[in-house]
Amino acid sequence: MSVEQHQQALLESYQGTNDPKVQESARTANEYTELLKSGQVSKDEYIQMMQDIIRVNNINRSVDNMQVLEHMNTAINGLINLASLV
């Protein structure tokens, strides 16, 4: 999948829920991706920041939002993998 496809998956993950934690995580991941694309953060900084989002998501995971958070974590992992290839 491309960066744009993973970003679209993030968009879908927070549009499909009213949970503010999910919405904030997805928006933050998208902002970090834009920072990487514009060269404002290094690949290593980006990967660390994205992994931090996953750690926070795992802490915040609730039964009601498990599927949404898992979908978001999959998209974030895809973005991390793409960044690692650059």
Region spans (language model):
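Cationic, hydrophobic amphipathic alpha-helical membrane-interacting segments
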Residues: 1-86
